[in-house]
Every structure is written in C-alpha cells, then in structure tokens.
Amino acid sequence: MALYCRDTLIIIFQKLTVADLARASCVCKVWNSVATEDDLVVSAFTAPWRIKELVGRPASVSFWRDNGIWKFAISHRICRGDSVTSLAVKYAVQVMDIKRLNNMMSDHGIYSRDRLLIPISNPEILANTTCYVELDKYAKREVAVLYLEGAPKREQPVPGTNQQSNLSADGKRRLIESLRRSMQVDDGTALYYLAIAEGDPRSALSEFSADLRWERQAGLN
C-alpha cells in the first residue's frame, strides 16, 4: 500500500519530469491528487532550467504539459530605433523566430507594441532567475517571461487606445484602413502612427516615412 501513501508518492513524484507527472496523474484519484499539486508541477516545470522562482499561475492547465525552452522568453522594452533585425542580432536569435513568437505579420508590427518577447537562445541565462507567467496580449499565448532588468513594470497602455476623436467608429475604421493600405502595414502599426500624430493622417504618414528613412540609413532593412 506504499504506493497509495501520500508522503511516499510525493517523494517519488518529486523526481519525475512534467510528462511523467502527467502520466502519473492518470493512474488513479490518489495519484492524481498528488501529481497535480502546484508545488510538484512547478518544480518539475522549472527543474531542467534551474529557475529559482516561477511567479504567477497560468490561466490554462495545459501550460504545464510542456516545459520546452520555447515556453520561456525574454521581455524587451521597445526603444526608438529598435527593429526586429537589430533585436535578432542583439539576442542572437532568428528574425522569423521573433516574429513567430510575437504573432507579427510584418517587421513594422514592432511600432504598435511597448515590448517584444525574445526567444531564449542560451538556456543558461535562465539559471537562478525569476520568471513570470504571463498571457501576452499581442502574442496571444502564455509564456514564462524573464525580465533582464529585474522585475516587470506596470503595464503601459497600448498606443492609441486612449486617444479622443470626434470620428465615429466607422470613420475611425475607414481612416485606419486607408493608412494601412498607404503604409502597407498591419492595423496595429497604422493605429500607432495615427496615435503619435494625434489623429492627423498626414502627420502619421510623415512620421512613418521618417522612420523608414532612418532604418534605411542605419542599414536595418
């Protein structure tokens, strides 16, 4: 009956991987109650990467099914002059991997965000760190996020969400659609430039053109 003793099961399950814990939870109710305990699951999830602490809990339990390196990411706060290419070089990752992780269709999608998630290229960077389980609103996925600067800052509003305008909802939609076609970018990027131009489409196009010129001069395209 030792395999039904809770204390014995905890000692055994502490040595299991995430996948093995999932299998153990299917054996019987007793095993399930132990194998799904938060402490055991978190320990198994973080153990391969030697993470010191995992803060937060995912909205979906399916998050725990896989603890591959792709479940972790670095949070990079966007600064003026950043581009997907320059960040790929900085963090030694592929451009397509950044775009895929962040659910970006074009490089200009960077301008509609206050941060990007950067894939982990060197697992050693996770050792003895604190990661935060977050649902990224742009990437539309839950990830364990590492903040190289120490801790997450209070979330900033999405550019353009607090802009006041006399346009109707339909008028705004048409304006954004027109800018999107002119700039050949996604809606988020068009909305960003419209926001920093305080609703003036001509100024938005000028700002966008200025950024493109800067990128070309800096050799980032």
Swiss-Prot record:
Keyword hit for Ribonucleoprotein: no
Might you name a Gene Ontology BP term for this protein? protein ubiquitination
Q: Which domain of life is it from?
A: Eukaryota
Residue ranges of every copy of the F-box domain listed in the record: 7-46
- Outline the subunit composition: Part of a SCF (ASK-cullin-F-box) protein ligase complex. Interacts with SKP1A/ASK1, SKP1B/ASK2, ASK4, ASK11 and ASK13.
Q: Does the keyword NADP apply?
A: no
Q: Which SMART domains match?
A: LysM
Give the metabolic or biological pathway: Protein modification; protein ubiquitination
**InterPro entries, sorted:** F-box-like_dom_sf, F-box_dom, LYSM1-4, LysM_dom, LysM_dom_sf
Q: Identify this protein by name.
A: F-box protein At1g55000
Looking at the record, the residues that make up the LysM domain are: 74-118
Q: Which UniProt keywords apply?
A: Ubl conjugation pathway
The free-text domain remark for this protein reads: The F-box is necessary for the interaction with ASK proteins.
Question: Gene3D superfamilies in the record, alphabetically?
Answer: 1.20.1280.50, LysM domain (3.10.350.10)
**Which PROSITE patterns does this entry report, sorted A to Z?**
LYSM
**Main function:** Component of SCF(ASK-cullin-F-box) E3 ubiquitin ligase complexes, which may mediate the ubiquitination and subsequent proteasomal degradation of target proteins.
Q: What PANTHER family has UniProt attached to this entry?
A: LD22649P (PTHR20932:SF8), LYSM AND PUTATIVE PEPTIDOGLYCAN-BINDING DOMAIN-CONTAINING PROTEIN (PTHR20932)
Please give the organism: Arabidopsis thaliana (Mouse-ear cress)
